[in-house]
């Protein structure tokens, strides 16, 4: 039995009507384009120019000088999912 802990990391982003954060576990987190003011104002090309930082613990968008973290995304999702119930 494998008892090692797997660290959840961001694998990639997929863009359509929302931003899909694909994790190495196979899970997806969905963010609206108004997640931050800079992301809201960015065009698709600026958002598609991203790189993973911190070994997959965050995302850097150099064209809009924005960094977001997996921890921040999880906090956002938790609070917004609770508000929706």
Q: Language-model features: where?
A:
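Motif-centric detector for short Cys/His coordination patterns
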Residues: 1-85
